[in-house]
Structure formats: C-alpha cells, structure tokens
Amino acid sequence: MTTVPLTDVEDVELTLIARDVSDLLRAMLGPKGHPDAGSLIFPTMPLMGLVTEESFHYLSNAPQQSSLQPLPTLLFSRFGRAVTKTRARIKLFDDTDGGADGLVEILELAHSRSVEWFREPHRGPIRSLIRRFQPDLGIFFVGENLIASTHAVLPAMGITLNELKDFSSNDMERLVERSFAFSSEVGVYLGQLATFLHQLGKRVELQPEAPDIRDLRVSHNDFIGANVYRLALYSFRPNEARFVGAVIMALAHINAALYVLPRLLGVKSNLLLRFQLLTAYHAGKTLEASIPQILPPISEAERTVLRSRQVRNLCAHFGLRGAAQTAMAAEDPFGAALQSLISVSRSEVEAVVNQWLNTVSDLLTARLSKSSLAPCRAWLGSHS
C-alpha cells in the first residue's frame, strides 16, 4: 500500500510525542543506581500509562494511507487493562470506571488485602500476639511531604478492582514479578516506538542524560493503616469518612508533581506540565468534593487555567486538535497550543499551576506529614 508523507500537523504532533518519550525514559532510567531508585518509580507510574497508551492510540487511529501505523506490540495484549488503569489513577474521583465510589472501594480493598497479607505469617497462639503490632501500610516521603503509599500503589500499578477482589496472599507475593514483567514490556514498547519515530525523522533519547538527583532522598515509614486513617480523618475532616484514602492519594499526587517529577523530568518538560495540570484539575475536583473547607478559593483567572476542560484534554491526549494551526508555527508548540485555548501564556500557566499546587500541598501537609505521623509508626516496621 502506498503511504503519503507526514502532514504538517502530524509532524509537530510527532515532535511533541518524541519529546515526551525522551522525558519519560529520563524519569525511568535516571534513578538507576540511586539509593532510593525503587521508591522513585512510584510517581512515574501514571506517566508510563499516559505516554504508552496515548502514543498507541495516536498511531492506531491514523488514516489508512498515512505513514503512521500501530506498532506490533505485546504490551496491550498482555497488559492493556493495566496500562489503562495505571494511567487512570491520576483522575481520582473522575475515573470513568467507577468514579468516587470505585476509587473508595479499591482503596479500602487494597487496605484489607494488605492487612491479610502482612498478618498471614503470624498464625498460631503465640505468633498471633505479634499481629497487633504488624504494619500493613508503607508511606514514602520527601522531607515532610508524603509522595506515595502502598495502599495507593496497588491500584496505581494497574491492578483492577475485580483482580484485587480475587487476590490471595500468593498473588501479593508475586507482585514484584508482575511489576517487573509489566515494566519490561513497557520498555520494549518504548524501544519500538523510538525506532519508529526515528524512521520518521524524530529523535528519541534512548540513553538520556541522567538528572542530578544526588540530594533527592526518599524516606519510608511503616504503619498500621487503621491508625493512619484515624489520624487523617481527624486532621482533614472530610465530608464523608470514606473519602480519607482519596484525600491522601490526592496529596501524594500533588507532592509528586512538586518534589519528585521536576527533578526527574526537568522543569521545562512538556510531560511535567501535562502531569501538573492534570493533577491540579483532577486532584482539585476530588478535594473540592471531599475537603472543601480546607481549600483556598480560586479566582476566575485561576479557574481558567485549573478547571479548563480544553486544557485537561490537551494534556491527557497527544493530538493537538483545534490548537494545531497555532502550534505548527511556534517555537514552543505545546505552549502555543495552551495559549490558543485559554489566551494565557505558558509562563503564566506554569506560575498559576505551581502556586496552586504549593498552596494546597502546604495546607494539607500541615495536617498530615512525616512528623505528624511519627507517633503512629508501627513498632515492627521499617523506618528511615
């Protein structure tokens, strides 16, 4: 079949995709050899889902005569649902697969499965005494700031609600193996994508320069989950007690967007700005629904940036759509696309979103931080 050359729109869209792939690889490979490399992978999980799924959809939906074509990958036949759910966790209450009720249910189930898993070895009349002090929740911090929890990581790994319902202790033991297989398949797909983009004249940095993160340290404390949620419930006083896990997850996304991903991706990364805007949009809506009394009011100018459905769609998808004509002629296509939608420059967008993220992080961290959680640490846990 005869193919046609890239259109001008495809050319700029592929340039942006190649940059995002390079940035994702930088975030995935950069921590190699870092003492906290295992913990730094948690904040990048939604980005893996976003870049892989959106690039696959972009190529798969190209016209039949286009130079673009879907890649022959096993990622989506083996882990398609996991990719979708990994990417969807950034949506929090806005996830179309269950909404607020679905997120609450999977977080509660992740908690109960963790309790069962960690208590499993301690059966019998004597060892059962240990169970009272057995941790079932790990929380990761950068400084005082909570960036991830193991209860939220389970669904963020792409494990669905139905899968988690059927999980046994043996399945939990195999999570590391599953995670490795998933990450390996993501790596294979990104290599295929980089090769294809190179054939179209788009360069992907397969061995990007490692970020300087020597001073970025992640600490870890173990807890009995019920004690943490009791303290968080008292501190946040959400509209409904069942929302407390979602509030903690939103805080983790916000802090990852502020304290981890800028170091891994670079502060001028389009992929970073996508994540920060998506976090402000979805975490903002989730927190407005759960703890509105804590959030600061936002002005109409801020709302234009933080609650724009058009901006959300531009960040969540790889096609430029109505913003393409403006983006094609610009030195910064992504910034130009944003400005064409809301008449706000990229620098102003970055200032607004960072101010909101910092303000909300400060307000929530004043109520839930490494120091405030210290009295809840499990006696039998691991702490750093």
Feature locations, PLM:
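Histidine-centered, metal-coordinating catalytic motifs and their short helical/loop contexts
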Residues: 301-339
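Amphipathic alpha-helical interface segments
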Residues: 1-304, 340-384
